[in-house]
Each structure stands twice: as structure tokens, then as C-alpha cells.
């Protein structure tokens, strides 16, 4: 299952839907799927 935008994500277990970027704030924690520009 993929993760919708603005929700918590991590690889490889919970990748973002639609090839969105999973961006982490602090190292490898607090990662969220980014919205497209």
C-alpha cells in the first residue's frame, strides 16, 4: 500500500503514492510525502 501526500512515509515499507518524494525533516525520522509543485 502506498502513502498519500502529507502522510508519514518510509522506504521500503511505506512508499508514497504516484512516485511522490518522501521527505524527512530530521535524518531518517518524521518523513512525509511531499506534494508536487
From Swiss-Prot:
Disulfide bonds join 2-17, 9-22, 16-33, 24-31. Expressed by the venom gland. Pfam families: Toxin_9. Its main location: secreted. GO terms for molecular function: calcium channel regulator activity; ion channel inhibitor activity; toxin activity. GO terms for cellular component: extracellular region. Keywords: Calcium channel impairing toxin, Disulfide bond, Ion channel impairing toxin, Knottin, Neurotoxin, Secreted, Toxin, Voltage-gated calcium channel impairing toxin. It is found in: Secreted. The presence of a 'disulfide through disulfide knot' structurally defines this protein as a knottin. Belongs to the neurotoxin 02 (plectoxin) family. Antagonist of L-type calcium channels (Cav1/CACNA1). This is U10-ctenitoxin-Co1a. It comes from Ctenus ornatus. The lineage of its organism: Eukaryota, Metazoa, Ecdysozoa, Arthropoda, Chelicerata.
Amino acid at each position: 500500500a502506498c502513502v498519500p501526500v502529507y502522510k508519514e512515509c518510509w522506504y521500503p515499507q511505506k512508499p508514497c503514492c504516484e512516485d511522490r518524494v518522501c521527505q524527512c525533516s530530521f535524518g531518517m525520522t518524521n518523513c512525509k510525502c511531499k506534494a508536487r509543485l
